A protein has these predicted regions:
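Short, flexible loop motifs at catalytic/binding sites
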Residues: 1-74
Length: 74
């Protein structure tokens, strides 16, 4: 999780803002994540990174599509 947050922190912040209600991350130094939504979100972002989709300008749309389909579980 630390690696994912460090590598994609801006995308992580974007993801946190997208949640309802929004999550308020304290920063990349947070080591223990217990909120299931955070774990699922980071897992989804990592999944997109592993598949190279984060390099695409429409990665947010792909992420939302993944979320709609149930996401990639943490």
């Amino acid at each position: 999780v630390k690696f994912i947050v460090a590598q994609n922190y801006q995308r992580y912040l974007w993801w946190c803002r997208e949640q309802n209600p929004p999550l308020n991350p304290r920063g990349p130094e947070v080591r223990y994540v217990t909120d299931a939504r955070v774990l699922r979100g980071l897992s989804n972002i990592n999944y997109l990174c592993l598949n190279g989709w984060m390099d695409r300008p429409d990665w947010r749309d792909i992420y939302h599509e993944l979320l709609i389909r149930g996401g990639r579980q943490a």
